Amino acid sequence: MKAAWLLALAAGPIVGSIAAGEEARVFRAACVKVDITPETPQWLQGYRPRRSEGVHDRIYHRIAAMDDGTTTFFLVSTDICTITPPYYDALCERLERELGIEPGRVWWSTTHTHSAPHVGPQDLGPLFVATLGDRYSIEHDRAYWARVTDALVAGIEQARSRLEPARLGVVTGTARANVNRRERKADGRIALGVHPEGPVDRQVGLIRLERPDGTPIALVANYAIHGTALGGGNTQISGDVPGFVAEYVEGKVGAPLLFVNGAEGNVAPLYSVGSNIHDPRLKEYETLLGDAIVAANASMTATTADVSLALGKTVVETPRRAGLGWTDRLADYASVSDDGTPQVRVPVYSLTINRDTVIWAAPLELFCEIAMNVRDASPFANTLYFGLTNGSLLYLPTKAAFAEGGYEPNVSPFTDRAEADFTSAVTR
């Protein structure tokens, strides 16, 4: 069922808002950073099968908790490539069972580094063996999966226990750290590469959580970029650009930075260095993106303790790629239309902050044009898209990209109707 939440939330009352005459609620926030760097070699996700041979930089869960007096919300940013929607669902079931946290109150975003371990089963990727080859023919380290999940549950509980009076602010900036990656070859083929004239989203979205005295609790930075500055020959565990940048900004501002990817489906880092983890160009991301985040933070002129949070969710149904199989674990993400066409069911989540900011999130590698079109249609002052959140259903390209071909359409479970179905569902 298609539900119109983006415009409807702008026009209607905010769920949980304070009625006239009520005592103002106290907004509270907290942040926890948990090291999940493995102690043993791990198979790295992304590219061909590779077993890690060391650690270049450590990887983390970063967990922000927010509470407006009615709604408690947790945002997680984890330095891994992807999880599947059923893996997220299992986390939600555990959080409800052990901590009493209702499903949907926790969003789990992965930064999409291609130099971190696999976590959880991979449900869709193996269906595209003709394109992806043997990259999923690896051993699963379920003990490490359990460590990652246990650490996340404990971190969420710890963040909730540390909630303190806070203020919140939102600002946007710009960074030129990314580039369209759908390169057109001389023979007309589309291949992964660099397309400098192609569409790219360079908006930096920034949320600041601070104490009443102005000292920072956490920053949340939203930017579209594949975690592929390090290539398929790298065997060192790394957070890639999101991890480099987070550590750099944390050193500058003195608080954790949650990096949440945007619509990075057709967006690459400006520089990729292959397996040369000592390439000096990697440091340039500190300037290209890290300093842009620091500048956006410095430009924030106001924060507020008067914060109201409203969570929403809808499901977009759109046709499934003809002939594509499905797995039992993804049964909740499939349906059949009245005319017998197999459908993919895509959950879309929303967080509205007061009446000026909306964040929408989906378990997708969305093409940037789609997110930018939604932003252009939004009545909110700030509209942010959180990609690869609460799982991954792989790529959702534009209709034009399906016609052009290339890597992303070849590993998409969708059809060329997906762009229109998805956009109309969240903007009308």
Whereabouts are the PLM-identified features?
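Anionic-ligand-binding alpha/beta catalytic cores of soluble enzymes and soluble regulatory domains
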Residues: 289
